[in-house]
Amino acid sequence: MVSLFVIGCIFINLGGKLLVEHFQLPLWMDSFGTVVAAYVLGPVCGAVVGASLNISYGLLFSYTQMIYGLINIAIGIIIGICAKKGYLDYLFGVLSVSFFVTLMSASAGTVLSYAFFDGALDNIWADGVCTFLEHIGCNMILSHV
């Protein structure tokens, strides 16, 4: 039963990623399944689900996206640990953990994008906002965060 749940969470991640790519949405929806798996089954399963998405997507569509699996792994670990410690049992904890995960994801994504893709985000909305911010005079690194 657990294995079916994990596979379902991987498909939730894959569906979110494909939906965003198809409709060119300004969102990253490839970690919903990671969060659900980490919350229900713990940090190890959350990390496995997060890594599985990026590995499978990389093998099927674009191997360059595999590096972002590190972010999904971190999301799974953070959510899983916070759920086990009870931080997600009350609103302030949920908001605090959400803020931390968002900050970590944006920071790590920026570092990985610069390290491997010269800052390109492969999302039309995100690249447009970054270009606009650079055009009006924002620092290049700050505009990507």
Model-derived features with residue positions:
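Hydrophobic alpha-helical transmembrane segments
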Residues: V2-I7, A47-A51, M66-L70, L91-F100
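Hydrophobic transmembrane alpha-helices
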Residues: M1-V40, V44-I55
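Membrane-embedded alpha-helical hairpins and interfacial helices in multi-pass inner-membrane proteins
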Residues: K17-W28, M66-I67, Y87-V145
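Alpha-helical transmembrane segments and their immediate interhelical/interface regions
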Residues: N54-G93
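Alpha-helical transmembrane segments of multipass membrane proteins
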Residues: C9-G16, V49, L53, Y57, ...
